[in-house]
Amino acid sequence: MSGAAARGDRLVGTWLLVICFMIFGMVVGGGHARTIGAGFVIQTWQPFTGIVPPLTHAAWERAFGLYKATAQYQAMQPKMTLAQFQSLYLPMFLDRDWGRLMAVVFLVPLAVFRLRGRISNRLTAWLLFLFGLGAGEATMGWYMTYEGMTSRILQPSPLYLGPHFVLAMLIFTAMLWTALTLRNPEPAILPGLARLRGLLSVSIGLIIATIGLGALVAASGALKVYNTFPLMDGHALPPHALAMHPLWLNFLANKATVQFEHRVAATVTAIVVVIAAAMGLRAPVGAKARDLFLLLAGLVSLQYILGMSTLVSGMAELGYVHELNAVLLLAACIACRHALRGATAAVPLPVYEMKAAE
């Protein structure tokens, strides 16, 4: 690859890293809006024209009037003032505008890079596919809001929030991997580390699955059902964990079961990631990769401590920090896995042994 082509790929990779940062920003904004209960406060859906918040007192009163008609307001917020409504409205509004900005930051550079021949047909198709997934992600978010406009539910459904978050993490994973590959196109050959590479792949899948279960806990209000650790009020498996019918409904809607699932998944994930980090720190992976494994070890330890603290305290705000650190943990695991993409199963024989074998 020529120097100019390599610089072009690095530039495209840097742009995709910006998109990854913006996806993380969506998690920051969306998680904050959910934590403060702002998911249903905006009762209009204007993806192209709603880029400016209400600017006059009359406009604010109209927006507040729409919210007053919702079941959430009538059941949970009947004494809310206009000032309180504004404090909820603006974080949700900024989250929506951040999504609009992300679409612009993605599509405009994509068109420019394409017109200048900086990206291939294959990469263009791949990025458009990821954009399509992002559009599906936005549609899923819209539907959760739409439910609050048209039905009597009081908060976004965990059955939508869980897949919504998982899809976001899958997009984040694919985007980050693509960015890292463009910035570092030549994998380092690392003999004998194929098992570690596979363990990191498993770790990525476990982290994403655990994040999805965490979203179920947050959306269903399961955080405060049991606030002891490691047992759940003295029980390994909580009573009534399988009380709902049909049986499968317990794993999605039973608060005790949902919290139990997340506890088990988090513990298994932490063990697997710690093993992967320990193997990486002992392996001949190079200084840069070693730093990544150190970061991975630190983040998984912090994540488990945050999870335990969130459970014991019952604080949704601490759970929000736990959620953000989960994305950082996922990013670190992806970076470690990417650094080992040139790992092979066999360790090559020394030259003299190869000659003797001949």
Curated annotation (Swiss-Prot):
BP GO annotations: heme A biosynthetic process
Residue intervals passing through the bilayer: 11-31, 98-117, 123-143, 159-179, 199-219, 264-284, 292-312, 315-335
Pfam families (alphabetical): COX15-CtaA
One GO MF term attached to the UniProt entry: oxidoreductase activity, acting on NAD(P)H, heme protein as acceptor
GO cellular component, one term: plasma membrane
Enzyme Commission (EC) number: 1.17.99.9
Top EC class for this record: oxidoreductase
Subcellular location: Cell membrane
Binding site for heme: H262, H322
Membrane disposition: Multi-pass membrane protein
Catalyses which reaction(s): Fe(II)-heme o + 2 A + H2O = Fe(II)-heme a + 2 AH2
Pathway: Porphyrin-containing compound metabolism; heme A biosynthesis; heme A from heme O: step 1/1
Entry keyword set: Cell membrane, Heme biosynthesis, Iron, Membrane, Metal-binding, Oxidoreductase, Transmembrane, Transmembrane helix
Cofactor(s) it depends on: heme b
Role according to the record: Catalyzes the conversion of heme O to heme A by two successive hydroxylations of the methyl group at C8. The first hydroxylation forms heme I, the second hydroxylation results in an unstable dihydroxymethyl group, which spontaneously dehydrates, resulting in the formyl group of heme A.
Quaternary structure, from the entry: Interacts with CtaB.
Family, per entry: Belongs to the COX15/CtaA family. Type 2 subfamily.
Protein name (Swiss-Prot/TrEMBL): Heme A synthase 1
Organism the protein comes from: Acidiphilium cryptum (strain JF-5)
